[in-house]
Amino acid sequence: MSDKPTETVSVSESVATPAVAATEPAPSLPVVNPSSLPSGFEWWRQTMAYKTGFMSAEESVQYEQDRLIKERYAECLSCEKNKQWVMAYSPTVRFMKDQIEKIGGDISSNNVFCDHCDDFKAGGFHPKYGILVCQNHVKSRSHLEDTLAHEMVHYYDNTKFKVDWMNLKHHACSEIRASTLSGECRMMNELMKGKLARLTRGHQECAKRRAILSVMANPGCKDEAQATQVVNEVWDSCFNDTRPFDTIYR
């Protein structure tokens, strides 16, 4: 198979463009060691006082800040634990990592980051910084696996084809490939979301739907009509381009 992409190649979904996770900065929080925050009985006492209105306004603000720090810390720990497991044991993720390294890319825990995201994305890819996993939106280990596999397809495309992420056809093609190959559009996922009305073409409809939504987020895209047109133009070649896989496995 030629190294030339079958259309112009594309990019990411939990994305934002240009191949970037367009996540807004999370609200600024002070740098605090979570172990220094109230815990055990004292944290329970503060929680009860907060819920029953026995805190002053100043105490309530401090409690809400402490609670947010605790929640984000717990999210981060869970995301990091699942990330490490998936990168070590997921056949899809390990295969993609090997394929990326074969074409000169370098992907490891050092450029796959867990962080809090304000927009409703599961993750994103940036050609300079790597992969972002949105710790507050990834619901489970399997969801993280699908998200990481999706973004790794973008990473692969960017490394192999030198994608221009502001080119809507490039972006659309990689989005189609990422949704098709990552497993996020497999039948069970769609059934659980209640979106698989027609079993025979559910996978394709899912990949197309997700690609259109991602292209719509590209600053160079005018509206849904343009995104739909671009996705349709590259659909056949990009959906059938399963590199680096032999076929659609998930």
From Swiss-Prot:
Pfam families: Peptidase_M76. The keyword Mitochondrion applies. One of its GO terms (molecular function) is metalloendopeptidase activity. InterPro entries: Peptidase_M76_ATP23 (IPR019165). It is a peripheral membrane protein. Its EC number is 3.4.24.-. Has a dual role in the assembly of mitochondrial ATPase. Acts as a protease that removes N-terminal residues of mitochondrial ATPase CF(0) subunit 6 at the intermembrane space side. Also involved in the correct assembly of the membrane-embedded ATPase CF(0) particle, probably mediating association of subunit 6 with the subunit 9 ring. Belongs to the peptidase M76 family. PANTHER family: MITOCHONDRIAL INNER MEMBRANE PROTEASE, MITOCHONDRIAL INNER MEMBRANE PROTEASE ATP23 HOMOLOG. This is Mitochondrial inner membrane protease ATP23. It comes from Yarrowia lipolytica (strain CLIB 122 / E 150) (Yeast).
